[in-house]
């Protein structure tokens, strides 16, 4: 249920992952809204609704599917990562951006990028290509992409 941290309204929402009650979060304060969803095996319509009308998004771009398939993980781990209860791939995020993204968010943070099964540049290029292929090319550059990192802070936005 909804809770507050000072004036910040936080709305948890259910995501698909193989954990006990996994959630993403939607944040609202003074007319600014954002959402964060990592550890998501799929980006379904229910999650897409929580991401709508946000000024910024932080979404998982965990892996390149081919890198997982040829990588060193045991088969059962590969199957888990690639499943709808695993992690969101670059391609799955790109599909969301091309087909379900409402284009309100001006900033998209690519998050939870696997060191073993992804490359930040591949994740970035996949998302950028999806935005550029959108049917409304004038909007392609209206959403700025940002990489997040496991060992250092990301940029801070002044919204």
Predicted regions and their residues:
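Short, active-site-adjacent cap segments at secondary-structure transitions
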Residues: 3, 116-118, 153-155
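Residues at the C-termini of beta-strands that transition into short coil/loop
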Residues: 14-16, 60, 149-151
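Cofactor-binding loop segments of dinucleotide-utilizing enzymes, especially the Rossmann-like FAD-
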Residues: 39, 113, 150
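Short, basic/aromatic-enriched C-terminal tail that caps enzymatic domains
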Residues: 143-159
